[in-house]
Amino acid sequence: MSTFRLALIQLQVSSIKSDNLTRACSLVREAAKQGANIVSLPECFNSPYGTTYFPDYAEKIPGESTQKLSEVAKESSIYLIGGSIPEEDAGKLYNTCSVFGPDGSLLVKHRKIHLFDIDVPGKITFQESKTLSPGDSFSTFDTPYCKVGLGICYDMRFAELAQIYAQRGCQLLVYPGAFNLTTGPAHWELLQRARAVDNQVYVATASPARDDKASYVAWGHSTVVDPWGQVLTKAGTEETILYSDIDLKKLAEIRQQIPILKQKRADLYTVESKKP
């Protein structure tokens, strides 16, 4: 199957977890009704984003939130990329994305590898590492359409991760993410287009909707970029479902026209994973 429909849910996240779960599942069902085959929720979709919130909202996996995601994936017969939630495991907290298949089974669990620790004087200072621990594994899953690679937000800044996913056969990279009003306008679209062109893959980002009253204000603008670096579709800042029909034939044509993946000089340089 050379084409499939991707849906990105730009959810308006509140401080009430049960409301977030109910709304997220409702929008997933709507996306499925509109023909989506793969659906992604945004980063931290079940709780406000912030180091003070992570411990209070953290759950085990499986747990309340992932059980709901499993059920709605099965009900809707879709592949569901569950954005991310704060996960508690063995006394540590992680920023974790769970993916469910059309039968409701857990396909893969991605823990954010690169923690968001930045300090831009006069603009924003944030340290996920105050409460979160980093993941230590690559995360891909297979579908009848293509192999998909996963990252969360800050992971997108690291070109090596995307390159390893491309080496492993991924044709779509999905990054649930919540850039802010400093990094968003500067780097959000730029990074997506760079990862797409560098690796000749589709890149999709699912952001929460913007809430100007939140302690951390998300940039919004969920986006899909094709392997040519063209923005196929981009949301504004409000809650919405973004749809894009992914054409893998176009990906193959681009790789044939500009065969950079075959032209890399392994005799001079390499990017390789140190773990499976």
From Swiss-Prot:
Its EC number is 3.5.1.3. It comes from the Eukaryota. CDD domains: nit (cd07572). The modification Phosphoserine is found at residue 26. The modification N6-succinyllysine is found at residues 68, 123, 130. It is found in: Cytoplasm. The active site is at 43 (proton acceptor), 112 (proton donor), 153 (nucleophile). Its main location: cytoplasm. It catalyses: a monoamide of a dicarboxylate + H2O = a dicarboxylate + NH4(+); 2-oxoglutaramate + H2O = 2-oxoglutarate + NH4(+); 2-oxosuccinamate + H2O = oxaloacetate + NH4(+). The modification N6-acetyllysine is found at residue 68. InterPro entries: C-N_Hydrolase, C-N_Hydrolase_sf, Nit1/2_C-N_Hydrolase. Homodimer. Belongs to the carbon-nitrogen hydrolase superfamily. NIT1/NIT2 family. PANTHER family: NITRILASE-RELATED, OMEGA-AMIDASE NIT2. Has omega-amidase activity. The role of omega-amidase is to remove potentially toxic intermediates by converting 2-oxoglutaramate and 2-oxosuccinamate to biologically useful 2-oxoglutarate and oxaloacetate, respectively. Can also hydrolyze gamma-monomethyl-alpha-ketoglutarate in vitro. This is Omega-amidase NIT2. It comes from Mus musculus (Mouse).
